[in-house]
Amino acid sequence: MEKTISQKLKEILLNADWTQEELARNLNTSQKTVNLWINEKSTPHLKYTQKIELLYLDIIGYVDINSEILSKRKSDAVSKKISVADIIKNNDVLDVLTLHLTYHTNTIEGSTMTLADVKEILCDENKVLSNKTAKEQIEAKNHRSALYFLLDELNDKADKFIWTKELILETHLRLMNSIVYDAGAFRNHGARISGSRVALANYIKIPALIEDLLRRLNAPADDLICFFAQTHCEFEKIHPFSDGNGRVGRLLLFVSALQHGIMPPLVLKEKKHAYYKYLEIAQINEKFELLETFIAESIIVTYNLLKNKTSE
C-alpha cells in the first residue's frame, strides 16, 4: 500500500534526524505548512508532493537506478578533480573538509554533537563541552588525527603510496585510541550488525581477507566509482575491528578517492538510511549500482561544499 504524505514526512524526519523547521527549509516552505501536512490538516499541491517524493527517496533510498542516470552521475563525479596537496596547502579547504567529515561520520555512528560543537572541539584543544560526553569529544579529535595521518601519508609518498595492513591498523589506533581496549588490532571474536542480514567475516579469516582487499586497493582501476563502491563494500563486510569499522571504512574511501585525484565523497548523516540500504544490497546481492550512484553523488556533495565555502 502506498504511504501517505504524512507517513513519508514522518519517515524523513526520523531518518534524517531533522526538526520540522529543517524539513521545511529543505522543501522551501514554512514550518507551519509542514506541520499541517504531517497532521493531515492540509494537502500539499502537486509541486510540493513531487518535492516530498524526491526528498523521501533521497533519504530513505531508491530501489533501482536508470543506467543512463548512473552513467551521468559517475561521469560528473570523476570530472571533479583535486589532489591531497591542494587540500594540505590550503588551510581553509582542510578545515572545512575535516569539520564536515568528522561531524557527519561520527553522527552516523551515534554522536549527538552538533556541527558547532565539533567546530569548537577541533578549534580549541583545551575546550571541554559540559553538555556532551567525554567519549564524543574524544571521537571528534581522534577522527581528525586519523584523517591527518592518512593525508600526510598520501602527500609524503605521492605516487609511491600503497595501502598496507599496518596503515589500516594505525588508522584504527588513532581513531579509537582511549575508546576501545583493542584499538589498532583486528577483532578476535565473532561479530554481527544488529538489524542487518549481512554475514560478517569469521575473525580467523580477517588477515587473509584484508590481504585480498589490499591487492584490490593497490591495483589499477578503470571504473573508479565502481572500484570505490566494491572496495568499500568489501571492507565493511570483512568488518575487521570490534568497533569503528564504519568510520575507518569511510576514511579509506575518502583517501582512496584522493589517491586517484578525485574529489573525496562526503557521506551525509541525513542519508544514513539510504547509505546502509545500498551497502547491504551490494553486500548480499553483489549489485553495486545504487551504491555507485550514492558514492558519485557524495563526491558532488563535497565539490559543492568546497565551492560554496571558498566563495563566501
Indicate residue ranges for each PLM-predicted region:
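FIC/Doc superfamily catalytic core
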Residues: 1-243, 247-312
